[in-house]
Each structure stands twice: as C-alpha cells, then as structure tokens.
From Swiss-Prot:
Primary gene name: ULK4
Taxonomic lineage of the native organism: Eukaryota, Metazoa, Chordata, Craniata, Vertebrata
Residue span, Protein kinase domain: 4-280
Induction or repression: Up-regulated during neuronal differentiation of neuroblastoma cells treated with all-trans or 9-cis retinoic acid.
Free-text function comment from the UniProt entry: May be involved in the remodeling of cytoskeletal components, such as alpha-tubulin, and in this way regulates neurite branching and elongation, as well as cell motility.
Gene source species: Homo sapiens (Human)
Similarity field: Belongs to the protein kinase superfamily. Ser/Thr protein kinase family. APG1/unc-51/ULK1 subfamily.
EC annotation from Swiss-Prot or TrEMBL: 2.7.11.1
Catalytic reaction(s) noted: L-seryl-[protein] + ATP = O-phospho-L-seryl-[protein] + ADP + H(+); L-threonyl-[protein] + ATP = O-phospho-L-threonyl-[protein] + ADP + H(+)
Protein name: Serine/threonine-protein kinase ULK4
Ranges of biased composition (kind: Polar residues): 364-373
SUPFAM superfamilies for the chain: ARM repeat, Protein kinase-like (PK-like)
Known tissue expression: Expressed in the brain, mainly in postmitotic neurons, including GABAergic neurons, but not in astrocytes (at protein level).
Domain notes: The protein kinase domain is predicted to be catalytically inactive.
Medical condition linked: Various anomalies in ULK4 gene have been reported for several cases of schizophrenia, schizophrenia plus bipolar disorder and autism. ULK4 gene has been proposed to be a rare susceptibility risk factor for a range of psychiatric diseases including schizophrenia.
Length: 1275
C-alpha cells in the first residue's frame, strides 16, 4: 500500500475534509476525502458505482482506504471548484456557456443512464469543474442502480459495520431521511413518494440548466412545505438573467426547459428527444439514436426487491461482471450488487488495520486551489478560495497583556467540535437496533406519512390523536390485540423521528397516556416499546412546555431501573429514554437561562446512572450512562451539576482505559472533557489517582477524537493553574504535544498550539525545547494554511486564532529573553570569577540564545522580531562577547568552555541569518553601523581563529550590502552620517590589522579583500586610504601566493579590487606600476585567457569568463592611462612648451611587456561574448597605436585566419573599421607583417570583398581602408 502526502485543505463538510494530495513517489495529484466512519454506507455506495467508470464527465475513482479513525477516498482532482461556486460568483451564465456546460452534463448523465445508474441528487454543488472548464459529476453518495432500494442498501452496509467505528457523529436521522437529497431539484413524482427514475434525473437536469441561466433554481423557498407546494402545483416562470443587460433566453432554450420541467413524467422529454433537440445545435448528432427511456430502463423483474433478502441480492460483487466480459453500453445494474459486503472493503481489512500516518501532512508550501469535492448528502462544503494575501506577511499588531492573552485563550479551549451532541436512543455506536417496521394493513387508523401529518387540519389531527389514544388505551385480551398495539407503537416510532410531529405529540394527551402505560402495562414488550416512543419524542422535540410531565416520566423510569437493576436487558431499553428526557430538560433550562422547579431531576436518577457506570456492568449499559453524562454536561444547567461528584472523573477514566470498543472509549473521555468544563477538579482527581505519566501517555492514542479531548482537558487544567508546575516542567509532556502537530486534524494541531502556549507563558525555558523540536517549522506550515477573511473555513479559522496568539506571545517574549541575557552578561562584565548567583543566572539565560536564531531564520517571525530595539540589544550582546573574547570577562568557568563557544557561535549565526534579508539592514542602517559593526570589527582581532573568520565574513558581507543600498524619502543625510561612521571605523580600527589579515591562510584574505572591493567600488575616498595604508604591496603578495588557484575566491577578490583601483581617477598609478602591476596583469591575463580558450573544459570556460572580462577591463584602463600621458607629451612637444617627455617614455617602456598579450588578444576576438570582443578589440587597438607591430606573432597564419573570419562575419561597420585600422597599423609599422599579409589568401579575399567596386555593400568609411591595405600589399 502506498502512502499519500496531504497538502492544503480544499473543502470541508460537517463530517468530511477534502485535501489536495499526492501519491508518495509520484507527481500525480489527487483529491483525498477524509470522512467519518458513520458515512460508510454513502462512501461504499459511491465506490461500488464508480470504481470502474472512466468517462471525461465523471470524476474518476482511484482507491479507498480505512484507517483507525476514518475512511479515505482517493479520486480525481478537479481544480476549478464547483458549479455552485461558478453560479454564485457570476450570478448567471450566458446562453452559449449554458449550452457548453449542458453538453458536458448530458454526456455524463447519458453515460450513467446507459449503465443503469441513476444520480438521484443532481445539484450544482455535486458538479465539479476541471481546469479547462470540463464539468464532471462527483459525489455518488445518493446515486443508485435503477429499481433498487437505497435505504435497504445503506441498512445492510451499516449492519455489516464492526463496533470499532471511530467517527465522531452518530446518525441523527433514520435511513429514510438519510437517502434524501436536495428537495430544490427533486421531481414532482418523487416528492409525491414515487421512486427515482431516468425521468426524474432529467427534471433535475432541467432545474440545473434553468439555474445556470437565471442564477436561481426554478422553484425555491426557505420553507420545505412551501417549496413542496410550488414544485407540485406551480409552473416555473420563464428564466430571466439577473444581469438585465444580457440577452433574454432564446425560444429553443425555453422550449428545452419546458420539455424537461413537465410535471407529468410521461410528457417529459425522453433521451431520444433530448439529444435531438435543436438547442444543442447537433452536438449529439453522432449519439446512439436508440437511446430512449425504454432502452435505458432495466426490467423491474430483474431489479424488483420486496424485502431484505432482495436487498442482499442487490449487493452483488462487480467482479462477476469482469469475469463474464460484460459488453460496453449494456445496462449494468446487476453488476453493482454485492452478495457479501465483507468482500467489498477498503484497503485495510485485508492488509491489517492501517494507521492515520499513511496520510502525511506536508510542511511544504503549495499554492491554494479552489477545488471543491463534496461528500455527504445535505453537507455544504466550505471551499477554500485562492489566497489573496500571504499569511506570512501577517503581523500581530499591538501589545497584548498577559491578562488579555489568557482571556482570549480561555475562549478557545472548547470548540463546537468538542461539544457535538449525538442521540442517546437508537445510537448504532452503542447498540445496533433492527430497523423499526410496521404493517399498515393491521393498523386500524389512517397511515399518514410525516409530510401528511404536518399538513393535517386541527380537526383531522385531533381525530387522528383520539384514534391513537383509543387504541393504546384498549385492553390486551388476546395476542392479536397485543400485536396490534405493538404495531401502532412501531408506527409512532417512525413518525416521532420528525421534529414538528414529535413536538406536537409530546405536548398532547398521548404523552401522559404513554407514561401511564409505561407504569401499568402487563406486557413488558409493550412497556419497552412505549419507553422507546417516549425516548424518540424527547430526542426530536424542539420545545418543552412547563406543564408537560417529563419529570414524572423521569421518576418512573428511575424507579423501574432501580427495581429491576439486575435485569440488564431492561436497563438497555429504559436508560436511553431516561437520558433523552434529562437532556431535553437540561437543554430547555439552558434556553430559559434560569432553573425551573417543575424540571428538577430527582437525585435518585443521578444515583442510578452513576451505578450504571461502575465496573462489572455490561459495556452497553456503561456506554449508555456515559453518553447520557456526555450530552447533559454539554449544557450549562442545574441537571449537569448533578453529575459532578468526586468519583465521576476516575470512573469515566476507568471506562476509557479498560474498554475495548473505541466508541465507548471516545464517549467516556468526551464525557470527562465536558464535566471538566464545569469542574476542573474532575480531571484533577483522575491525575491524582492514576498518575500524571499515565494520563500523558494517553495522548499517544491512535484515535483522533481521543487526542482532541485529551488536549482540551490539559488546556482546561493549565488555564485553572491545577498541576501547573508539574506540567510545565515535564519535558516528555512538551515533546508529546509537539508530536501532535504532525496530525492531519486541523483541530488537534490548533489545540496542541494552545496547550504549548499555556506552557510557554509559565515556563520560558520550554521555548528552547520546542524550537529544537521544530515548533517554528510547524508554525510556518500552518501559517500558510490560514488566511484571513470571511471565506476562511471554521477549522482553519480556529487554527488561525490559536496560532496568532502563540506567535504574538513568542514575539513579545523575545525582548524579555534578550533582556535576561544582557542582564546576566552585564552582571559579570569585567569579572574573572562570577558569584554563585551570577553563575546560576548565566546557566539559565545564555542557553536560550538558540531561540533567537530559530526566530530570525523564520519567515513568520523575522519581520516581527527584527526591530531597532532588537538590533541594539544584539549589538550590546556582541560587545559583551568582545569582552569575553578579549579575556576581560570570564564565563567559561561558569557555563563551561563548550557552552561558551556555542553561545558565541549562535550569536554570530543569528546576525548571519539577518543579513540574508538586506531590507532589514536598510531599515535600520544607522543602528547596524553604530552598534553591531564596532564589536564585529573588534572580534576580527580575536585569538580564536573561528571567531576571527566568522566576524570578518559577517563584516565583509554586511559592508557590501550597506554600501550597495540606495536611499530616498529624506534618508540621504542619515545615510551620509552612517557612511562616514563606517569609513572611520574601518580606517581607524580595521585597516591597521590588514597587514596580518591578508597574510593568513584561506579563506581569511578572501573576506578581507571582499570588504575592500565593496568600499573602493562605492567610495573614492577609500581608494586613497588603501594606498596610504600601504596595502598595495600586500595585495600583490597575496596575488603571488594564490595565482596557482586563479579561479578561487581570493584571486577573484584581488582582481575585482585591482579593477576598482585602476579605474579610479584619483588612484596613484605610479605606485601600482612600481609594485609590478604590468607583470602581474600579464601573468593573470595569460593564465585566464588560456582557461577560456581551452575548448575541452567548458566548466573552466564558464568560471573564467567573468574573470577574463575584469582583467581585460584592467588592461584597458592601463592602456587608456598610458595613451593619455603619451598624448599630453606629444601635445606639449608640438606646442613647444618645453616639458620633458621623459615620463611618457618611461611609462611606454614600463608597459612594453604588454605587447606580448597581442598574440592572446587576437584569439579572444571571436569570443561569443560581445563584451569580450569589444574590450579585447579596444585593448588591441591601443596597443598597436602605441607600439605598432612590435609583436612578431601578431600576424601569424592562425591570427591571419582569425582576422579573415572576423572581417567576413562581422557586419557592424564600426567593428570592421576598428579591425582594419589595427591591420593597417601593423603592416605600416612592420615590414614582416606586410610580407605575411601578401601571402594570406583568405584575408586578402575578405579585404577585396570590402573594397570599392567589389559588388558588396561596404560602408563608405570601411571600403577606403580595405583598399588602402590592398594597395599597400600590391593588390
């Protein structure tokens, strides 16, 4: 089995979360639905219908898994959101778009119907868009094979489910209500009670087309009864787009909608007529013309189901179809059946139970998508929209006092998901009950449906009620009479599942009659069924009137349970009803906000329930009692206070630890969690009885809900200060909490952040342990997943609130940490032997320095913690480090040599992290120059080689960044001041040390030279400082020592520095020449050019190219300087000013070795880099102007070929003219070169092409030059 990586959450429902995911080891992205196990029937249905369907308009199923807590469905990822979102955003769509979308819908639906599948619940939220705009049917939870009973299918799957289901919600409605979809798109015949059909799907399709065009469905009302009446009785209005500027609907479209929205299914469009409709403009011309309702429908004989046995036949394994080689296009209804649901399971039952960790939550940021994949019927997903603002730039504004912080934290301890209430009665997690059925034939009164009962007139209702009471009150003289009464009670069980009906029955005389029969009925079967009816009425009623005798029923039930306490079966019948009644009273009292004497629950009821929790009872009884406590303690009422005793916590904990059924364990810890909400001592009693370690170990549970409730309990404990000192000192506890940050559950991660915040508030030292356990990484990951705004999902919103508070606290804590470090260092400043108290303070504070490093390297914290105050404090710490390094202060004896060195290293590393973001230096330039750079400069003199190198590297990189920054908005003056301070600092403190620094082993000279490069590049004054500091000889000495590794960092810095010095107008060139500039440049240029011309080593070519360009730049500056001096001397000679030309002659003599470079410069001319050609040709031109053709190899055969190639390939007249002038100067100054040219056939031909009269289009300035050269050689 393969694991999956989960990225961001892209959809959410009440019981389902949808993630964008990726199969580990591949680049295939998928949608992964994580759903509670209570949705097993729906998910199983989806899988059995779609697992072999491959169609462009149907979301592809890949595979499914079952883990300890959830079902996981892996399907095709659709990145365009849902059709519901599109309609909501655009309000209405143009008719052309409706046609395009409609073609996709019809293609997909037609394919499903050909397979014998009815979608049954077509709505915009179940239609997804792929990136290019293709519509796809998704969420087949309520789809079915034509003719089957989906309710029975669900019941069969649910019956096969084991007791270890860990989903958080138990079904609140019956199977019948569970298989109902959205009524807005339901066909009239289905509303009346008929089964779904092809025709009803086509009605829904018509509603969808109508809504796309007009922006609203054809029938809509907030009231279900009003909506039903509209669907059954009214005709839809013609569709009108919301945007009045858009064209009205065409006659073809109106005709199409009229055909699809016929109330009589016999008159509705069939597939044949639909595909041939003119609205589609022959888009389905190639479709199967035999497609008709009759062809598509499956025989009722084949699919008929009359009872549970037939329902099992409907569940037949689709592998049989594969074995028989089923033909494409043939109705496949029978192929979706399962003979035995255990043969059709997600991956886990065959391979052993899987752990939730197979779905790993990614910590890598990914762009959000707006994919929407919805699951449960009736569930509205909250879809993520693309991020508009990055949460990483979110700053927690303002200072939050600890009182305000803890106040906000207390509000976050309990969430809605901690207080979910599920039914006590008919709860399949507690005990699976057979479906309640009644026989209408022996029911001696009208068999009204729930919908019919809702619309009965008062007189009819009273008549109905009288008949019911009469039959219940009748004596049971025979077995038949008893069966009839039981049948009637079964009927009441069915209708009591509806809220309005239950409310009316509870407040009718029937309720008093039921209590009476519960007390006196001789038949215990009837008593049990009466109790069941009472429980269902209590569970579903919406209001409770004060005169309703619920307390009488509670007292009676308590007495019956107490009198028959050894009868476990009887307790199992009566306890759920007792619990529902107490919970009903508690909720009503909470609504009324003050206790009612008439609703006071007797103490005996609490006593009975506590007895039912004890060891030795059957687990079902334990579970029922725990569920009652869980529900009642969700409320703030007098009833919940009755359960708060000294023994309740340990009893529930015993159930949690010793039960084998996960559902009971979850209920027990959930009940404990809710009791602790009223009285934290309940959990305190648990810790004192079983020990803190045992309780902490329960956080490692594989059940997500248990982890969630345990985190809630610990947060509640910490908020009250109970066991505070023990918990905040327990490193194992902190490590366990941080491990929970890997959970795929948003709620668990949020609560883990909240618990950590409580710990960090009271124990700052745990921040270091948390950072070492990757807390900052977890914060960054979840910060990417939380975006501010209304569109934020509830789970992410909760996570965002917890994260914001944690980030706010850590940001506010950092200055305190730095303050403590500064105080501890200030107290020992200048002392060789710190006192015991000072040693203790150092040991406590200095180890927290890594926290600073963790925060400044975080993109979440860095913008918030790096402030002017922070940099000032940091600079002060560096000053203390300087004192420690120089020996003025001794902390080695206090904390140890290793700890001292680690402290210094981390401090320097923190600034290294800051300078990776130059904007921070720009904002606080003066603070950096005035408070951080001086101690860094002092550390360059350190005796410790590591600190000397580290500080020099930081100084070099910081200086480079500072001098490269540009300032505006009135900051120029501050910039000038800081520049002068920086210059003075380097001049007075650093440059005097360079004599030793430059002669140290690598890489020290490289960083030292890099600083000089940055300063000389942007500050001409600094060039004079370099010369005055007598660094020039040292620079050339470094050159000699490192010339063997010319591509190394040191030589690159040397060449860059020489380039700056030579290019500076104020530079003392005579000093450079005296120190051997010419010979050094000749050597360096020769070696670098050789590397560039080596065709066999491309790596060296690429590395040497920038270096070569710098050296050529230096050469060009030298030659330009020389030619300028020579020109001035010639001008003086012509004018007869009498100036001595000796200086110019000496300079020419000094530069004469540069003529050896001519034979290197010519091969560089064909270089692919135009800049190298440009500077090489300029250098060559000046050299031949100054020295003519002195180099004997200037026009060697190889060089002649290069000139010939260049004159042929270069098209720019300026470049041609420059090359020709170089040639002319060579041949006119050296007879040997003239002779060489006479024999150069290729070069002569190139010159002939450029000469006048050759038929070429040579430039007017180029042609005479070419002709002049040809004439000189006799052509």
């Amino acid at each position: 089995m393969e694991n999956f990586i989960l990225y961001e959450e892209i959809g959410r429902g009440s019981k389902t979360v949808v993630y964008k995911g990726r199969r580990k080891g591949t680049i295939n992205f998928v949608a992964i639905l994580c759903t509670d196990k209570c949705k097993r029937p729906e998910i199983t249905n989806w899988v059995r219908l779609t697992r072999e369907i491959k169609h462009k308009n149907i979301v592809t199923f890949h595979e499914w898994y079952e883990t300890s807590n959830h079902l996981w469905l892996v399907v095709e990822l659709c990145t365009g959101g849902s059709l519901k979102t599109v309609i909501a955003q655009d309000e209405n769509l143009p008719e052309d778009v409706v046609r395009e979308f409609g073609i996709d819908l019809i293609s997909g639906l037609h394919h499903l119907h050909k397979l014998g599948i009815l979608f049954c619940d077509i709505s915009p939220r179940k239609i997804l868009l792929e990136g290019p705009g293709t519509l796809k049917f998704s969420n087949f939870c309520l789809a079915k094979v034509e003719g089957e009973n989906l309710e029975e299918f669900f019941a069969l799957v649910a019956a096969e489910e084991g007791g270890g289901d860990n989903g958080e919600n138990v079904l609140k409605k019956s199977m019948k209500s569970r298989v109902k979809g959205s009524p807005v798109y339901t066909a009239p015949e289905v509303v009346r009670g008929a089964d779904f059909s092809i025709s009803s799907d086509l009605w829904s399709l018509g509603c969808l087309l109508y809504e796309m065009f007009s922006g609203k469905p054809p029938f809509f009302s907030e009231s279900i009864s009003e909506l039903t009446e509209k669907i059954l009785c009214e005709d839809p209005l013609p569709p009108i787009p919301k945007d009045s500027s858009r064209p009205k609907a065409s006659s073809d479209f109106i005709n199409l909608l009229d055909g699809l929205l016929q109330r009589d299914p016999q008159k509705r469009l069939t597939w044949t007529r639909l595909l041939q409709h003119s609205f589609w403009k022959k888009a389905f011309a190639g479709a199967d013309q035999e497609s008709s309702v009759e062809d598509l429908s499956l025989s009722r004989n084949t699919m008929e189901c009359s009872g549970p046995q037939d329902s099992k036949e409907l569940l037949q394994n689709s592998q049989s179809r594969q074995a028989k080689g089923h033909k494409s296009g043939q109705p496949l209804g029978h192929s979706f059946r399962l003979e035995n649901p255990t043969e059709f399971r997600p991956k886990s039952t065959l391979e052993g139970q899987l752990n939730e960790s197979m779905f790993l939550l990614s910590s890598r940021p990914t762009p959000r998508t707006s994919t929407a994949v919805e699951v449960s019927p009736g569930e509205d997903m909250t879809h993520c929209s693309p991020q508009k603002t990055s949460p990483l730039t979110k700053i927690t504004s303002g200072h939050l006092s600890q009182q305000d912080l803890e106040s906000q934290m207390r509000e976050l301890i309990y969430t809605d998901s901690d207080l979910v209430v599920t039914p006590i009665i008919d709860n399949p997690k507690i005990m699976k009950q057979p479906p309640v059925k009644f026989d209408a034939k022996i029911l001696h009164l009208p068999t009204y449906s729930v919908d019919k009962l809702l619309f009965l007139k008062d007189q009819d209702w009273n008549d109905f009620l009288q008949q019911v009471c009469s039959q219940i009150d009748s004596t049971e003289k025979s077995m038949g009479a008893s069966r009839a009464k039981l049948n009637l009670l079964c009927y009441l069980c069915v209708v009591a599942g509806h809220q309005e009906v239950a409310t009316r029955l509870l407040h009718s005389p029937l309720f008093q009659l039921l209590i009476q029969h519960l007390r006196i009925a001789p038949n215990w079967d009837i008593r049990a069924k009466v109790a069941h009816v009472i429980g269902l009425l209590a569970s579903h009623t919406a209001e409770l009137q004060e005169n309703t005798p619920v307390v009488e029923a509670i007292v009676l039930l308590t007495e019956l349970i107490r009198e028959n306490f050894r009868n476990s079966k009887l307790k199992q019948c009566l306890l759920p009803t007792l619990g529902e009644l107490i919970y009903l009273v508690a909720t009503q009292e909470e609504k009324k906000k003050n206790p009612r004497e008439c609703w006071a629950v007797p103490l005996a009821a609490y006593t009975v329930l506590m007895r039912c929790l004890r060891e030795g009872e059957e687990r079902v009884v334990n579970h029922m009692a725990a569920k009652i406590i869980e529900n009642v303690c969700t409320t703030f009422s007098a009833q919940s206070q009755g359960f708060i005793t000294g023994e309740i916590g340990p009893i529930l904990w015993y159930l949690f630890r010793h039960s084998t059924a996960d559902s009971l364990r979850i209920t027990a810890v959930s009940a404990l969690c809710r009791i602790t909400r009223h009285s934290p001592t309940a959990f305190q009693n648990v810790i004192e009885k079983v020990g803190l370690n045992s309780v902490i170990n329960s956080l490692a549970s594989a059940i997500c809900k248990v982890q969630q409730y345990m985190l809630t309990l610990f947060a509640a404990m910490l908020s009250c200060g109970i066991h505070l000192q023990r918990l905040i000192q327990e490193k194992g506890f902190v490590s366990t909490i941080i491990r929970l940050l890997d959970s795929p559950s948003t709620c668990i991660r949020a609560k883990a952040f909240l618990v950590l915040l409580y710990i960090l508030i009271y124990n700052r030292e745990m921040l270091l342990l948390s950072c070492q356990a990757r807390l900052v990484m977890y914060i960054e990951r979840d910060s990417r997943k939380t975006t501010p705004g209304k569109e934020q999902q509830s789970g992410n919103e909760y996570l965002s609130k917890c994260l914001d508070l944690l980030i706010c606290h850590i940001v506010q804590e950092l200055p305190r940490i730095l303050g403590d470090i500064l105080n501890s260092l200030a107290n020992v400043s200048g002392r060789k032997h710190p006192s015991t108290v000072q040693v203790k303070q150092l040991k406590l504070c200095l180890p927290l320095m890594p926290v600073v490093l963790h925060l400044v390297t975080s993109q979440v914290f860095r913008p918030q913690v790096v402030t002017e105050e922070f940099l000032f404090s940091y600079g002060t710490i560096l000053s203390h480090i300087k004192s420690v390094d120089s020996g003025e202060t001794n902390i080695d004896g206090a904390i140890g040599l290793t700890a001292s060195e680690e402290f210094i290293k981390i401090t320097l590393s923190a600034f290294e992290a800051i300078i990776q973001y130059p904007i921070l230096l720009k904002d606080y330039r003066s603070t950096v120059v005035d408070y951080i750079l001086p101690p860094l400069v002092s550390l360059v003199q350190s005796q410790n080689v590591e600190w000397r190198l580290f500080s020099l590297r930081l100084l070099s990189e910081t200086t480079s960044l500072l001098v490269n920054q540009e300032f505006g908005d009135g900051k120029e003056k501050a910039s000038v001041d800081s520049d002068s301070n920086l210059l003075a600092l380097i001049r007075d403190v650093l440059l005097p040390q360079y004599e030793h620094i430059l002669l140290e082993p690598d890489p020290v000279p490289a960083y030292a030279l890099k600083l000089l490069v940055a300063m000389t590049e942007h500050n001409p004054t600094f060039t004079r400082l370099v010369e005055e500091s007598k660094l020039i000889p040292l620079i050339f000495e470094v050159t000699l020592e490192h010339q063997e590794s010319i591509l190394g960092n040191t030589m690159q810095s040397v060449i860059a520095l020489l380039s700056n010095l030579v290019a500076c107008k104020d530079s003392n060139m005579e000093l450079l020449y005296e120190q051997g500039l010419v010979s050094h440049i000749c050597n360096l240029l020769t070696e670098t050019a050789t590397l560039c011309l080596d065709v066999d080593n491309k790596n060296n070519n690429e590395m040497a190219a920038p270096l070569l360009f710098s050296l050529l730049d230096i050469l060009h500056s030298m030659l330009t300087y020389t030619s300028g001096i020579v020109r001035l001397a010639l001008q003086a000679q012509k004018s007869g000013s009498g100036e001595d030309p000796q200086a110019a002659e000496d300079l020419l003599l000094l530069n004469r070795p540069l003529t050896d470079l001519i034979s290197l410069l010519i091969p560089l001319l064909p270089n692919e880099d135009p800049e190298i050609f440009d500077v090489s040709s300029k250098c060559l031109s000046i050299l031949v102007q100054l020295y003519g053709g002195e180099n004997p190899d200037s026009l060697s055969p190889e060089n002649v070929e290069i000139f010939a190639h260049l004159l042929t390939s270069k098209e720019d007249p300026k470049e041609q003219k420059l090359l020709l002038r170089i040639l002319r100067r060579m041949i006119t100054s050296n007879e040997k070169h003239l002779e060489s040219l006479k024999n150069a056939g290729s070069l002569l031909r190139a010159l002939e092409r450029l000469a006048p009269g050759s038929g070429s289009f040579a430039d007017s300035a180029v042609a005479p030059l070419a002709l002049e050269i040809l004439q000189a050689v006799g052509h």
